[in-house]
Amino acid sequence: MKCVPGLCSEVVSVIEDFIRQKVAESGASGVVLGLSGGVDSSTVAYLAVNALGPDRVLGLIMPSSTTPRDDLRHARTVADELGIESETIDIDPIIESLTGLCSHNANELALANLKPRARMVILYYHANSLNRLVAGTGNRTELLLGYFTKYGDGGVDMLPIGGLYKGQVRELAGRLGVPPEIIKKPPTAGLWHGQTDEEELGMKYDLLDELLCLLVDRKLPVEEVASTLSLPPSEVERIASMVKGSEHKLKPPEVPDIWEVMECSH
């Protein structure tokens, strides 16, 4: 029996109501989101248009030299099919400018993280200029694993699909009418040439979803999760360490507790 449940019919209306509520509470005029051409951003775009209408949704397509051509084409397809305003901004000049200002050479991780952080800056520039909120496109699988960049693609105002595992997002995308070629293609963040999420994570999303559901939602011990999924305990431990090690990404910056000391000084 699968741990990750199928989607009930109310999920779409709950998420769309959530988007409408957050926009109304903030007094914003709509949302801005990054369109990567992947299933997550496409799904959020469809939900946002259903919730707010196409005139209140702006899609920013922000490719770099490592963005697959299919992703760029798919992002434009989504914008065209939904009838939303879109803008394409090449982020390579921004990356080159920033790295040129530093006195030391960046390692691969620093360079990879710079791309989503540059995109975050562009998203908020547009959001602030247009009185809109930034709608994030992260899913529950990515959030639990910390598979996102702190203050990059994690820097958003709301996460409409943040409660859904990757497989559930694919299911929802199918219901919403996202093109099948987008749903079925291997997910990639396009951080370097040939990069795919599942190769980097070392596990297929379907299996990751089940593992995380058993480990986090049902709180089963590592040994039981490993037995249930016929995995080596070391693999479950590896994922558990990723979850534990990335908890800081989901929390605000920590502040020292100084009030007791201040009160004692009187």
Curated annotation (Swiss-Prot):
> Which reaction does this enzyme catalyse, per its entry?
deamido-NAD(+) + NH4(+) + ATP = AMP + diphosphate + NAD(+) + H(+)
Example GO biological process: NAD biosynthetic process
> Which protein, by its recorded name, is this?
NH(3)-dependent NAD(+) synthetase
* EC number, as in UniProt: 6.3.1.5
Write out the GO MF terms. Answer: ATP binding; glutaminase activity; metal ion binding; NAD+ synthase (glutamine-hydrolyzing) activity; NAD+ synthase activity
Signal peptide span per the entry?
Answer: none
Output the PANTHER family linked to this UniProt entry.
GLUTAMINE-DEPENDENT NAD(+) SYNTHETASE (PTHR23090:SF9), NH 3 /GLUTAMINE-DEPENDENT NAD + SYNTHETASE (PTHR23090)
Instruction: Locate the residues binding Mg(2+).
Output: 40, 142
Keyword NAD assigned: yes
Keyword Zinc recorded: no
Q: Which family does it belong to?
A: Belongs to the NAD synthetase family.
> What SUPFAM superfamilies does the record tag this protein with?
Adenine nucleotide alpha hydrolases-like (SSF52402)
**What are the binding positions for deamido-NAD(+) in this chain?**
117, 150, 157, 248-249
Q: How does it assemble?
A: Homodimer.
**What keywords appear on the UniProt entry?**
ATP-binding, Ligase, Magnesium, Metal-binding, NAD, Nucleotide-binding
**HAMAP family linked to this entry:** NadE_ammonia_dep
Spell out the InterPro entries in the cross-references.
NAD/GMP_synthase, NAD_synthase, NH(3)-dep_NAD(+)_synth, Rossmann-like_a/b/a_fold
From the UniProt record, give the pathway where this protein acts: Cofactor biosynthesis; NAD(+) biosynthesis; NAD(+) from deamido-NAD(+) (ammonia route): step 1/1
Q: Taxonomically, which superkingdom?
A: Archaea
Q: What residues bind ATP, as annotated?
A: 34-41, 137, 166, 188
Native species of this protein? Answer: Methanothermobacter thermautotrophicus (strain ATCC 29096 / DSM 1053 / JCM 10044 / NBRC 100330 / Delta H) (Methanobacterium thermoautotrophicum)
Q: Which GO terms describe its cellular component?
A: cytoplasm
